[in-house]
Amino acid sequence: MGLSEAEWQLVLHVWAKVEADLSGHGQEILIRLFKGHPETLEKFDKFKHLKSEAEMKASEDLKKHGHTVLTALGGILKKKGHHEAELKPLAQSHATKHKIPIKYLEFISDAIIHVLHSKHPSDFGADAQGAMTKALELFRKDIAAKYKELGFHG
């Protein structure tokens, strides 16, 4: 399930575009997640009150959280699958404190793919989409294993 070096390069090439505006990309990804899967909003006490897309777009807290999410994900992607040190605290907090089911990580992965394709179509063609999908699947598989170690079966 690992990625080739060429696939990692495709992932990191588009990720450089994301890093130019982590907050904007993150906010857009979270909005897509919450609109497509409203049940995910219930896991975020400070966002539960945001009912419309306009409210979400106006939320500085949502923008900040999007930045945080993508900063963490970028750190993981840059490790090219050697992300044990980065994954452990993330799995710990998401399993024990936030109780985020793996299914929700699938939902946000889909949102990431969609937003990257819509914002960067020339840099995110079929090969890059396939590589990013594999990278996100690897992340989810590894975090699911950590969840299991922690006794969380979300």
Swiss-Prot record:
Q: Where is the Globin domain?
A: 2-148
SUPFAM superfamilies recorded: Globin-like
Short name of any one Pfam family annotated for the protein: Globin
Recite the lineage of the species. Eukaryota, Metazoa, Chordata, Craniata, Vertebrata
Q: What is its main location?
A: cytoplasm
**What is the stated purpose of this protein?**
Monomeric heme protein which primary function is to store oxygen and facilitate its diffusion within muscle tissues. Reversibly binds oxygen through a pentacoordinated heme iron and enables its timely and efficient release as needed during periods of heightened demand. Depending on the oxidative conditions of tissues and cells, and in addition to its ability to bind oxygen, it also has a nitrite reductase activity whereby it regulates the production of bioactive nitric oxide.
| Gene field | MB
Q: From the UniProt record, list the reaction(s) this protein catalyses.
A: Fe(III)-heme b-[protein] + nitric oxide + H2O = Fe(II)-heme b-[protein] + nitrite + 2 H(+); H2O2 + AH2 = A + 2 H2O
Q: Which organism is it from?
A: Mesoplodon carlhubbsi (Hubb's beaked whale)
UniProt: nitrite binding residues: 65
- What is the protein name for this chain? Myoglobin
Gene3D superfamilies, per the entry:
6.10.140.2100, 6.10.140.2110
